[in-house]
């Protein structure tokens, strides 16, 4: 089936914002005019050379793009199989891939005359990126963050506040990313006149999934020419791998390769404590089924009555009970493969990256790296894997320390996490 559809993989979504049966826009009447206005503005921006010239300038001179494509030589030798490259998006300004998309959305917000920006965040990286760009352009910034995530991502909370953002802890549900997104949507409904909702992932109502994907696709576009420079003209990766919560970093890497049938595409979900009936994971594609959440139809963790389940992951950025609709479509068509990695496996990969390459990864890309360590030894030495190192691990050191048994309670952040 995947071979039959190969010419259409990059054409979505359709005019209704759907990827097959997934996507769409399930929003209130209050929000629909704003959603349609946003779509209209983005369609204009997409063909506006001045918009992309400003984006290119900001990506280069503010973010620091292109991010390096790094051959992980020691890790490759240690694994003893395929060549492993890391796309180093953790070296971006703000420390993750999130800023790629935030810049685009806030440029759109300014074109629409919006003066107040709201965002949701889980790991804090989207919140930091949004606060950063708002500070640059002098815009008011409000970030919704689950109370549980506020505790486990304390360094990023301080960064957001230092940058001038108001951080609102969300206490409903489990206090994680889903709950933060719920409250951000409620805010947007009541403040449509001056407020722009800057969504951090390839989820939400159309046009967000496509718009965020387009801004993040700079990742995969760079990989295409960077790998050709290092491995020879025309050389493509044999496999691309990225971690998936909502799926923006993965979609950014995957999309430019969707029409290259020789490129294997693998998304790595958060397996938490194991993908089983206990639902102590956030592997929506591996352990969920289709439903509607946050304005779009996609795969979700839900019970027999259709109620959304909380899920679980050591990684705040992957702790989301759904997935972007384009990923759901790629899963259904067979163009991409989706697997899960447990917390334990991600922690092992985190430590391996530190020891082998001197790179402290965030817990999110540690999931992708864990799958690399599983498959690379079984692949030939001329097989090239590119994984997206989508964030750095500064924000996760207290979480990792606690799970590895290190006592950091004498630090202020450590005391906060103990409480």
From Swiss-Prot:
GO cellular component, one term: cytoplasm
Residue numbers bearing the N6-(pyridoxal phosphate)lysine modification: 98
PROSITE patterns registered for this protein in UniProt: TRP_SYNTHASE_BETA
A GO term for molecular function: tryptophan synthase activity
Needed cofactors: pyridoxal 5'-phosphate
Pfam family, one: PALP
Superkingdom of origin organism: Bacteria
Catalytic activities: (1S,2R)-1-C-(indol-3-yl)glycerol 3-phosphate + L-serine = D-glyceraldehyde 3-phosphate + L-tryptophan + H2O
Enzyme Commission code: 4.2.1.20
Pathway assigned to this chain's UniProt record: Amino-acid biosynthesis; L-tryptophan biosynthesis; L-tryptophan from chorismate: step 5/5
Record keywords: Amino-acid biosynthesis, Aromatic amino acid biosynthesis, Lyase, Pyridoxal phosphate, Tryptophan biosynthesis
Keyword RNA-binding tagged: no
Subunit composition and interactions: Tetramer of two alpha and two beta chains.
Function: The beta subunit is responsible for the synthesis of L-tryptophan from indole and L-serine.
Entry's family note: Belongs to the TrpB family.
UniProt-listed NCBIfam families: trpB
Protein name: Tryptophan synthase beta chain
The organism of origin for this protein: Ruegeria sp. (strain TM1040)
Origin organism lineage: Bacteria, Pseudomonadati, Pseudomonadota, Alphaproteobacteria, Rhodobacterales
């Amino acid at each position: 089936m995947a071979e039959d559809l190969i010419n259409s993989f990059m054409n979505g979504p359709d005019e209704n914002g759907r990827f097959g049966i997934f996507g769409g826009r399930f929003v209130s009447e209050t929000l629909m005019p704003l959603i349609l206005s946003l779509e209209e503005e983005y369609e204009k921006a997409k063909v506006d050379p001045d918009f992309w010239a400003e984006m290119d300038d900001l990506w280069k001179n503010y973010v620091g793009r292109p991010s390096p494509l790094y051959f992980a030589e020691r890790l490759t030798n240690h694994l003893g199989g395929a060549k492993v490259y890391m796309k180093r998006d953790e070296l971006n300004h703000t420390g993750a891939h999130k800023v790629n998309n935030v810049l685009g959305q806030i440029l759109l917000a300014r074109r629409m005359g919006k003066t107040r920006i709201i965002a949701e965040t889980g790991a804090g990286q989207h919140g930091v990126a949004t606060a950063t760009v708002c500070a640059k352009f002098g815009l008011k910034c409000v970030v919704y963050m689950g109370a549980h995530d506020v505790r486990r991502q304390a360094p990023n909370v301080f960064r957001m506040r230092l940058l001038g953002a108001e951080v609102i802890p969300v206490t409903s549900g489990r206090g994680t990313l889903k709950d933060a997104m719920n409250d951000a949507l409620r805010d947007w409904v009541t403040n449509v006149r001056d407020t722009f909702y800057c969504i951090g992932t390839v989820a939400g109502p159309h046009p967000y999934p496509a718009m965020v994907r387009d801004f993040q696709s700079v990742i995969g576009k760079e990989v295409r020419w960077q790998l050709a420079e290092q491995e020879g003209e025309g050389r493509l990766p044999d496999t691309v791998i990225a971690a998936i919560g909502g799926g923006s970093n993965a979609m950014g890497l995957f999309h430019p390769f969707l029409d290259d049938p020789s490129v294997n595409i693998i998304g790595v979900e958060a397996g938490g404590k194991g993908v089983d009936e206990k639902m102590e994971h956030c592997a929506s594609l591996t352990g969920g089924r289709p439903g509607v959440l946050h304005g779009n139809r996609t795969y979700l963790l839900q019970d027999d009555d259709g109620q959304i389940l909380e899920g679980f992951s050591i990684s705040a950025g992957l702790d989301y009970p759904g997935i972007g609709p384009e990923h759901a479509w790629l899963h259904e068509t067979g163009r991409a493969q989706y697997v899960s990695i447990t917390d334990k496996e991600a922690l092992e990969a985190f430590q391996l990256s530190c020891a082998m390459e001197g790179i402290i990864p965030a817990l999110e890309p540690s999931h992708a790296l864990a799958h690399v360590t599983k498959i690379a030894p079984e692949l030939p030495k001329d097989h090239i894997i590119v994984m997206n190192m989508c964030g750095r691990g500064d924000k996760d050191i207290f979480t990792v320390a606690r799970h590895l048994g290190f006592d950091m309670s004498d630090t202020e952040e450590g005391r906060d996490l103990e409480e």
